[in-house]
């Protein structure tokens, strides 16, 4: 018989840098999960993606065991890294803070494709392009 899921916890953590301090400790501690076991496993799985924020979805079972799924980094993080900017524009309609080429946009779309609600690269590129436009990043051909 399958274990019963008691809770699903969603966190966004720096790759390879999870530690028992907040936000990880309190989120997992209230469900009785072994915090250090999670931190070690998460850090081992994400150490090759250092410098990125990696969302994680933790399923906690009634016997206090857990499994987790790592997602792809948020589109905004990938866009800021590719454009070489620190953050998006406060007024995206007026102030452009950077630009991306079509090839960079396609690379980000390929990275995000498993987590997006689409199947083709073209539609994934349109989704990422909309995110970039809202951040004040222009797309050049």
UniProtKB/Swiss-Prot annotation:
GO terms for molecular function: large ribosomal subunit rRNA binding; structural constituent of ribosome. InterPro entries: Ribosomal_uL11, Ribosomal_uL11_bac-typ, Ribosomal_uL11_C, Ribosomal_uL11_C_sf, Ribosomal_uL11_CS, Ribosomal_uL11_N, Ribosomal_uL11_N_sf. Gene3D superfamilies: Ribosomal protein L11, C-terminal domain, Ribosomal protein L11/L12, N-terminal domain. PROSITE patterns: RIBOSOMAL_L11. SMART domains: RL11 (SM00649). Keywords: Methylation, Ribonucleoprotein, Ribosomal protein, RNA-binding, rRNA-binding. One or more lysine residues are methylated. GO terms for biological process: translation. One of its GO terms (cellular component) is cytosolic large ribosomal subunit. It comes from the Bacteria. Forms part of the ribosomal stalk which helps the ribosome interact with GTP-bound translation factors. HAMAP family: Ribosomal_uL11. Part of the ribosomal stalk of the 50S ribosomal subunit. Interacts with L10 and the large rRNA to form the base of the stalk. L10 forms an elongated spine to which L12 dimers bind in a sequential fashion forming a multimeric L10(L12)X complex. Belongs to the universal ribosomal protein uL11 family. This is Large ribosomal subunit protein uL11. It comes from Prochlorococcus marinus (strain MIT 9313). The gene is rplK.
């Amino acid at each position: 018989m399958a274990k019963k899921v008691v809770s699903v916890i969603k966190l966004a953590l720096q790759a390879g840098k999870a530690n028992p301090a907040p936000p990880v400790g309190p989120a997992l501690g209230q469900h009785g999960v072994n915090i250090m076991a999670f931190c070690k496993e998460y850090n081992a799985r994400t150490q090759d993606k250092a410098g990125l924020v990696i969302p994680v979805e933790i399923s906690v079972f009634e016997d206090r065991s857990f499994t987790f799924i790592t997602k792809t980094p948020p589109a905004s993080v990938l866009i800021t890294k590719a454009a070489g900017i620190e953050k998006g524009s406060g007024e995206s309609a007026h102030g452009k803070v950077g630009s991306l080429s079509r090839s960079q946009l396609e690379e980000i779309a390929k990275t995000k494709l498993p987590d997006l609600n689409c199947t083709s690269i073209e539609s994934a590129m349109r989704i990422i392009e909309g995110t970039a436009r809202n951040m004040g990043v222009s797309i050049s051909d």
